[in-house]
Amino acid sequence: TDASHSIGANFISDEIYHGIQYEKKAVSALEVTDECYVINSFSKFFSMTGWRVGWMVVPQNHIRLVERLAQNLFICSPHVSQVAALEAMSCEEELSQNLNVYHKNRKIIMDGLQHIGLQTFAPPDGAFYFYIDISKYSDDSLSFCNDV
């Protein structure tokens, strides 16, 4: 945050995938400072993609500014989405089960990649995306993916 403030910028943390961690807990920007914007959603961790429900935490002195901006950009999420999102927050057992499925799938993919010779990759520590080094097979990732 010091770096962003030194150039007159605000620090924005996209925390859409928080909650989907495997090895260690992700740190929220709010654990470091209150002088940040945090963007989050029910889409990923709560498996509510398409329900159009999310939230934003802003510094106290910017709340009214963001409210005015939001009033001109969108109205609100559908009522049914808001009710479902509130209920989803109390579904701890289901959320834990979902995370276990992600964790098992992550292991299957990691083992499978190693089995087929793709042994250099960054395992996902949050979310479920793999960044794989394919340089010994191709220098063109698009062609490689099309061939696969």
What role is predicted for each listed range?
Residues 1-148:
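PLP-dependent class I/II
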